[in-house]
Structures are given as structure tokens and as C-alpha cells.
Amino acid sequence: MASVSTHENQEKGPHLPPPSKQSLLFCPKSKLHIHRSEISKIIRECQEESFWKRALPFSLVSMLVTQGLVHHGYLAANPRFGSLPKVALAGILGFGLGKASYIGVCQSKFHSFEGQLRGAGFGPGHNRHCLLTCEECKTKHGLSQERSSQPSAS
């Protein structure tokens, strides 16, 4: 019997707090519309692109240059390990520099995405007021907006 009542609650939609617990700034549509999939997609793209376009090339080039410098005698090889420590360090530094050099591109992707979603969970306007026009928001905030838009008689 308890499973029937929980099943009925699931059909109504996502769980919303009771009206007594909701703040005056609550808007059910804006709370339900969070773009997590798009954000995770941008993060994944940034990770893949930064690896293939910057980190891997920087790492390989720095390793090849370091090996060339060791081979031509500009850098001394370690007597026990040879050129391996210097080449490995160059690869790690090149990888880190490549990842760091791609930060600006990822930031621009997030800024362009933020511009598309202005007010829907991003930016300085987030959670200040209901930016979507929903029926509950119209009824709750309609009276207060009408009062504030009328000029005072004094």
C-alpha cells in the first residue's frame, strides 16, 4: 500500500518542497532546468581538446628537444639512468604547460555558454528572482510587481 502512494508521487514530477518551505524567490521551472549535461559536455570537450591539441604536442616536442640536447652534449646525461630523467621531466613540464595554455580557450567556451543561459542558473542574476514566466510566479509576484509599478500619490 505504501508503494502505491510513492508511485503516485513519482508521477506528479520531481520532488518540490512544500509551499510553506519555499522562499519568496522560488521558481519551479528555473530550479528544474539545470544544464548539467551541457556543462559536462563542455568539460569533456575541453579535456580532450587540451590533451590532443596542446598537452600531447608540447610534451612530445619538449621530450624530443631535450633528447636532442642530451645527444649533442648540451645537457649531460645521468651516468646511471642516461637521458631518461631529463626527458621524463621535459615531458611532464610540456604536458603541464600544454594543459595550462588551453585554459583561455575553455574559459571562452564557458563564457559563450553562459551568455546563452543568462539568468537560467548562471551569472550574477542567478537565484535573485524568477526569470522564467511560470504560472506560479505570475500569481505570487504579480501583485507585488503591480504595486511597485504604480507611482505613489504623495
Curated annotation (Swiss-Prot):
Residues 1-23 are annotated as: Disordered. InterPro entries: OCAD1/2, OCIA_dom. It holds the Pfam family OCIA. Coiled coil: none annotated. Transmembrane segments: none annotated. It comes from the Eukaryota. It is found in: Endosome; Mitochondrion; Mitochondrion inner membrane. The keyword Membrane applies. GO terms for cellular component: endosome. One of its GO terms (biological process) is response to bacterium. The modification N6-acetyllysine is found at residue 41. Residues 1-120 form the OCIA domain. Keywords: Acetylation, Endosome, Membrane, Mitochondrion, Mitochondrion inner membrane. Has an essential role in the assembly of mitochondrial respiratory chain complex III. Is also required for STAT3 activation and plays a role in cell migration. Interacts (via OCIA domain) with OCIAD1/ASRIJ and STAT3. This is OCIA domain-containing protein 2.
